[in-house]
Amino acid sequence: MADQLTPSLDIPAALKPRDGRFGSGPSKVRPEQLQALTNTAATLFGTSHRQAPVKNLVGRVRAGLAELFSLPDGYQVILGNGGATAFWDAAAFGLIDKRSLHLTYGEFSSKFASAVAKNPFIDEPIVIKSDPGSAPKPTGDPSVDVIAWAHNETSTGVAVPVRRPTGSGGALIAIDATSGAGGLPVDIAQTDAYYFAPQKNFASDGGLWLAIMSPAALARVDSITASGRWVPDFLSLPIAVENSLKNQTYNTPAICTLALLAEQLDWLLGNGGLEWAVKRTADSSQRLYAWAEDRPYTTPFVVDPALRSQVVGTIDFTDDVDAAAVAKILRANGIIDTEPYRKLGRNQLRVAMFPAVEPDDVRALTECVDWIVERL
């Protein structure tokens, strides 16, 4: 592993990417977003979130997401504080009636299943598990009323298409889209709760969850509320729905997060929307995977090309190349956050290819890796 013996190498400036941020979240924030914060600071920061300037900002975010995902009639953009981690608990309290089914194939898909298993008001979930780097096929079960999986498993770089599985019946489809939303293709009509935090494809900060909820999901929220189930106010979906429809959050939101998100939505929509974003991430990922398959010392960690993510690429290295040393040298040269997910424990690099990342910078990254490996 990389240590004090890792050589000090200065990558030629001509090889380096223009922007060296490849983190899988928090991710690259475009300079134009930061400039927009400066331009609007006086009218937004330090003002009440119950008044027009901030409410208009929330409305701008909700309208932007509705346009980006071409929401069907009756679908609503709901939001609350706490990130996707908070939404897992909110869904356990307010979206699952009796029992859920979870596909788990990495750290984050497993965490939702774990949160549900700890909730005292619902039954033990069904968990269908596969090893990291692969994924189970979405399936239904007559005993469940929610079926959940991750559009993109950030820890491993596995992407699972979003389609209502055969045999799902009336079960709600809940998709963790934290690293998929805005960078992978999706038909929102195939989901009932498509939820995410904005620090990945949307190039914002964390601490906020957003969920695109279907009429069926909104009706489920109402029915669970009517049942009298106890729910902490902070995790209450009916409170989140009520406030969201007023372009508010239950408690004070981080204005910076909302403003960065709004700017990124404007940028995505101005360039062609989700179709453009998906083509861009496809371009970046094709460059990364083609390089990895061409080199004798690298292979894509995800063996099945159909499961390889367009937005988070994981690349294994042969035993004679220390990927940790490569990442350390990259970081010393301003090319950062290419380390693998900490708990995966593999000799690999992980590369985010969200829309804000230039495809040419992905190619430049691969050239830098080649340059380093030649000198190790």
From Swiss-Prot:
Gene Ontology cellular-component annotations: cytoplasm
Any one GO molecular-function label of the UniProt entry: pyridoxal phosphate binding
Q: Where in the cell is it found?
A: Cytoplasm
Cross-referenced InterPro entries, in alphabetical order? Aminotrans_V_dom (IPR000192), Pser_aminoTfrase (IPR022278), Pser_aminoTfrase_mycobac (IPR006272), PyrdxlP-dep_Trfase (IPR015424), PyrdxlP-dep_Trfase_major (IPR015421), PyrdxlP-dep_Trfase_small (IPR015422)
Q: Which UniProt keywords apply?
A: Amino-acid biosynthesis, Aminotransferase, Cytoplasm, Pyridoxal phosphate, Pyridoxine biosynthesis, Serine biosynthesis, Transferase
Which pathway is this protein assigned to?
Amino-acid biosynthesis; L-serine biosynthesis; L-serine from 3-phospho-D-glycerate: step 2/3; Cofactor biosynthesis; pyridoxine 5'-phosphate biosynthesis; pyridoxine 5'-phosphate from D-erythrose 4-phosphate: step 3/5
Positions of L-glutamate binding? R50
In the record, biological process GO terms are: glycine biosynthetic process, by transamination of glyoxylate; L-serine biosynthetic process; pyridoxine biosynthetic process
Q: Where does pyridoxal 5'-phosphate bind?
A: A84, T85, F108, T154, D176, Q199, N251, T252
Cofactor: binding comment: Binds 1 pyridoxal phosphate per subunit.
Which SUPFAM superfamilies does this one have?
Answer: PLP-dependent transferases
Q: Which domain of life is it from?
A: Bacteria
Q: What is its EC number?
A: 2.6.1.52
UniProt modified residues of type N6-(pyridoxal phosphate)lysine: K200
Q: Into which family does the record put it?
A: Belongs to the class-V pyridoxal-phosphate-dependent aminotransferase family. SerC subfamily.
The function of this protein is:
Catalyzes the reversible conversion of 3-phosphohydroxypyruvate to phosphoserine and of 3-hydroxy-2-oxo-4-phosphonooxybutanoate to phosphohydroxythreonine.
* Subunit: Homodimer.
* Protein name, as recorded: Putative phosphoserine aminotransferase
Species name: Mycobacterium leprae (strain TN)
